[in-house]
Amino acid sequence: MKAHLDLAHDIGARNLLLVLGEYIWQKEVIPPSVQWGWAVEAVREAGDYARENGLEIVIELEPFSMSIVNTVDLMAAFIREVGHPAVFANIDVSHVVLSGAQPSELRKLKGLAHHVHFSDCDGKVHGDLPPGKGVIDFAPWLRELAALDMPGVLSIELEFCPQPDRIVEWVRDAYRETARMMAEAGLRQR
């Protein structure tokens, strides 16, 4: 992870996003509490290195049954247990929605979050659709994000574009819709 933090530092990034056990943890042979402990220890160590280099690590909730951090409660517990001044939560709105959380649950992350991924989904999988192209009602989520009074940033997260020849339009639409929603929520001037 140090090489990734070095790269983030070299390119002037603010943080490095870390996903814990998206696909690799079976929770069968090695008890989940042991896996959790290893993750806490590794993130603390990485947090030391990040802080030495003026960076932060933000942890992302993944809504998969085998993920170490797959609910808002586990996200808050993990960040608190790591207890490091350079380690925070990344709130990926579509992931939080897919985990079954309600907007009010974001309050559990007050003081613990420094970054937001903003994308939509079909309600079944996180396809990182442009905001407004899926099923999420973003207004209550934006109200809760505003109440967190986070020092971090909101970034639009887009992945697979089904029409590669329209990728520029896809990105522009995502930006326009996000700017509109944020302005309506009082989070951004038009």
Where are these predicted regions, by residue range?
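An active-site-proximal structural segment forming one wall of the substrate-binding cleft
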Residues: 1-15, 37-53
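Histidine-acidic metal/acid-base catalytic patches
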Residues: 6, 12-14, 44, 69-88, ...
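Short beta-strand segments at enzyme active-site cores
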Residues: 13-21, 54-60, 153-156
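Surface-exposed, active-site-proximal loop segments in enzymatic domains
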Residues: 21-35, 163-170
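Conserved beta-strand edge residues that scaffold enzyme active sites
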Residues: 22-23, 64-65, 159
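Short coil/turn segments at secondary-structure junctions
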Residues: 26-31, 59-62, 125, 129, ...
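Glycine-rich "substrate-gating" loop/helix at the edge of Rossmann-like oxidoreductase active sites
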Residues: 35, 65, 98
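Aromatic-lined carbohydrate-recognition surfaces of secreted/lumenal glycan-active proteins
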Residues: 55-67, 91
